[in-house]
């Protein structure tokens, strides 16, 4: 619960309060109202709800339907003149975050908070951290793929970083479940849209950076993307940074006055020797480690998670056990066909992660290698050219372009755009299951491999803004083993 006096105090302290308008009368204060529910969904309303009118696509009819359902107060950046008092603010997203924190009694102060950002690897690193911390603590986790608020039951996530009203509600639930730590993925969009406004993390980890999420509805430029990624570092008590990342010198200078650890090449904390399923680390994590996820980049993610968890109370023994136990749905999942050929299913969905994935596969498989790939519609349009550039460095790979969350675009047009950046002939099979079936029928022996990239564990296709039925890459591949 929260009183209107408390709401106004929060907004005024943040210099975000403008005024309350009611029937053309202006008010600086208001008393005698208590809210027991916060919402930004006009279909989720009670008379004691405080409603937030947010988003570029917000429509007057949404608010009108909420008023009909009994709504008595709303927060907005303008007066919609619907006959009830409006609390006007300069920034609705900032207001949502701070009011939610107060409403849920600041649950972030009752948890140790660990956040990962980066173009790729956030989910894998989060899973490493979850498995490390659960050895001796009680972690909750919010990841792109799955969320757990009790450390035991998992449910599918809708956003990499939830909207602030949902985020602090979930934090409060984690606290009530007795959780001690919370692991989060924090996207650049989370800072762009202020979902984590006012939140300070105990440890923030910057895994890597490469051009992605640049387009009309995301970041206008790489500089904007990079800046919003770095906001995690500004809002963390201690930071962990990959010394092998692009623009590391800049980031290292930026965090020089913070409590920090660097990991990766040319740093104290690095992998000294690695093989497929084990590695030896030096530095703060010195020792021998077993790992289920092959690839140097996964070992780097494990190092990042280990260093972060070391700061949050994990022992070296916890770190070793947690890394050894970690597997991630849709990340480097490997199936073996009857003829011995390997099928790799991975979420790699941008140029950099695709390149890393293909490096691992080509290191291990020396026969014919095929790749099934697509690109999502209406977002991350720069990926299509990036995919082409990467695939031009692997001329021996047989490429089949297919559907991957086309949304409101034509999947054929998306595939043709990717193909236009590839300097050899490729096939287009729009039906993703048919593409997988075809590619698996073309393998001949144990040295061959099929890589199915982009969707990972997603058991849906996004078409015209809605999730449509799709069994998922791993399940489809299992059908044709």
Swiss-Prot record:
Location(s) in or outside the cell: Cytoplasm
Entry annotated with the keyword Nucleotide-binding: yes
Keyword tags: ATP-binding, Cell cycle, Cell division, Cell shape, Cell wall biogenesis/degradation, Cytoplasm, Ligase, Nucleotide-binding, Peptidoglycan synthesis
Catalyzed reactions: UDP-N-acetyl-alpha-D-muramoyl-L-alanyl-D-glutamate + L-lysine + ATP = UDP-N-acetyl-alpha-D-muramoyl-L-alanyl-gamma-D-glutamyl-L-lysine + ADP + phosphate + H(+)
Pfam family, one: Mur_ligase_M
Record-listed ATP binding positions: 118-124
Sequence motif: L-lysine recognition motif, positions: 404-407
Pathway the protein acts in: Cell wall biogenesis; peptidoglycan biosynthesis
Enzyme class at the top of the EC tree: ligase
Entry PTM: Carboxylation is probably crucial for Mg(2+) binding and, consequently, for the gamma-phosphate positioning of ATP.
Molecular functions per Gene Ontology: ATP binding; magnesium ion binding; UDP-N-acetylmuramoyl-L-alanyl-D-glutamate-L-lysine ligase activity
Cross-referenced Gene3D superfamilies: Mur ligase, C-terminal domain, Mur-like, catalytic domain, MurE/MurF, N-terminal domain
Listed InterPro entries: Mur-like_cat_sf, Mur_ligase_C, Mur_ligase_C_dom_sf, Mur_ligase_cen, MurE/MurF_N, UDP-N-AcMur-Glu-dNH2Pim_ligase
Protein's GO biological process: cell division; cell wall organization; peptidoglycan biosynthetic process; regulation of cell shape
Signal peptide feature range: none
EC number: 6.3.2.7
Binding of UDP-N-acetyl-alpha-D-muramoyl-L-alanyl-D-glutamate, residues: 42, 158, 160-161, 187, 195
Modification sites for N6-carboxylysine: 229
One Gene Ontology CC term in the entry: cytoplasm
Superkingdom per UniProt: Bacteria
Main function: Catalyzes the addition of L-lysine to the nucleotide precursor UDP-N-acetylmuramoyl-L-alanyl-D-glutamate (UMAG) in the biosynthesis of bacterial cell-wall peptidoglycan.
Family of the protein in this entry: Belongs to the MurCDEF family. MurE subfamily.
Name under which the protein is recorded: UDP-N-acetylmuramoyl-L-alanyl-D-glutamate--L-lysine ligase
Lineage: Bacteria, Bacillati, Bacillota, Bacilli, Lactobacillales
Protein's gene: murE
